[in-house]
Amino acid sequence: MRSGAAAPPAPAPDQRSPPGWCRAVDRRAGSPDNGQVTTHRLPTPDADRTSRLREALLTAGFTADGLLELLGAPAYTALARNETVPALRATRGGSPLEALARLFLLQHPVPYRQALRALPVEECLADGWLLRDGEEVRSGVDVRPYGGPEGQDWWIVSDLGCAVGGAGGVPVPADQQDGGPPGTAGARPRAGGEDDAGLVLGVGGASTTLAGITVRTPVARALDLGTGSGIQALHAVGHARRVTATDVNPRALAFARLTLALSGAGEAEFRQGSLFEPVQSERFDLIVSNPPFVISPGARLTYRDGGMAGDELCRTLVERSAEHLTDGGYCQLLANWEHTGSADWRERLAAWVPSGCDAWIVQRDVQDVTEYAELWLRDAGDHRAGRERYAARYDAWLEEFERRGTKAVGFGWITLRRSGSESPSVTVDEWPHPVQQPLGEAVREHFARQDFLRRTDDAELLTTTLKLADGVLQEQVGPPGAEDPEHVVLRQEFGMRRAARVDTVGAGFAGVCDGTLSAGRILDAIAQLLGEDPVVLRDRMPESIRMLVGQGFLEPVEG
């Protein structure tokens, strides 16, 4: 289990109800879901002690792969359903790995002597990674193993309760109060529905989706806008010479520093501020953002509520990104957007795209306003706050949606590329079907294909040699026993896993494209075979060929 795999595994990133791929909350692992998280004072380790802690985690096998081997698939996948009993049963042996799994994965206290066999306990207590509770120790922060794209063993550090049971949280011992120094009890319990603006989440479906779709070509500068616990910055240091991570929440910046330090992956520059304020006139080759995109009636939780009405935060990010991109640079973000009765959502989003930028917008899911409100009310723990309070907040959400004319909310991702073109390519897709991550290279290839189509007129297209992309299959649809199919579907096995309906001429054309003959010569041969006028076929087919190239079914052969 590598390449962006966290422990425990998230539900499939494109799952609906809840759509884990596009959420700021990770409800994958668990303990009792009673509506409490903790916001301890953060660890303040030095480099040497952090290195020793990292070596202890590696020595014990506290990695994504190690946990899967320890727990076994049934217990491991049960964590995704918020069930911890199988994992607790699998960690009764007292080994160093079992102790670490209980401490950091299940967030259960372990005896001091057992922890001593796995960790430099006194250093961890002094630095705030662990808290002493009599003869036991417990974790001060959430430490989640995460598999890097090239087999690296990384760890994401966040507030307790955010990866175990979601923002709704886990039990907090009664003696945990604010104000304790590192190494002592010092947490704040959070009851269901209570505001906690400083909460910092760990790795979840949204963050891993963004990491998967990000273009990973080597760049000079990358910006992680709204870094949270630092997962995007962690990825970026592997292919960017200089990484800047920003967040409005100072605790998030501190957690991101801990994530990079504990993972030993590289360094980044951290700046506090909202949106593009910390970087002002600076430009970047890559901007990534998993912003607080939730469309809510009021900003209660910094990690999810951006403080702007409706989808204004996402629109602002898109519109302002161009001035911070270098030529050819990418901006990639997750977003929610409103479906209103007054405008088509595709037209609304296309209008956000700044001039001089190509765009690829993909809507992965849609929820009506009642589903959407219920999703985020549960996320905040409001369903545990009492019937009257829950009803009042539910009503406030629906009142805000009615006031704004919002009928539904879309979930998806937006990629911009600063091309400088006077005729930019703006593609708006609705694709709720499974895809194959990582998609970063598929995103890069999408824009390369748009460049090709933009500079190639129909006459030149017919002189181009094309080949069928790898992993394209043909399906014939029609009643049993029919001599000819009603229609033909081309389907991709990889990447976006698109499907395109074509006629028999289009299917035959695609099947002959092997990189040896020009498109025009293939059409002439098909016309002769079918007894059609080749001039008519040459005039009719470029539109279909452009569709097949644009969606990646056919690839131009260079040279």
Regions found by a protein language model. Name each.
Residues 196, 204-289, 295:
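Conserved SAM/SAH cofactor-binding pocket of Class I
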Residues 249, 310-363:
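Conserved Class I SAM-dependent methyltransferase catalytic core
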Residues 250-251, 291-316:
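Mobile active-site "lid"/loop adjacent to the S-adenosyl-L-methionine
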Residues 369-447:
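Flexible, glycine-/basic-rich loop-and-beta segments that form/coincide
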Residues 111-202:
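Non-catalytic substrate-recognition/targeting regions of SAM-dependent transferases
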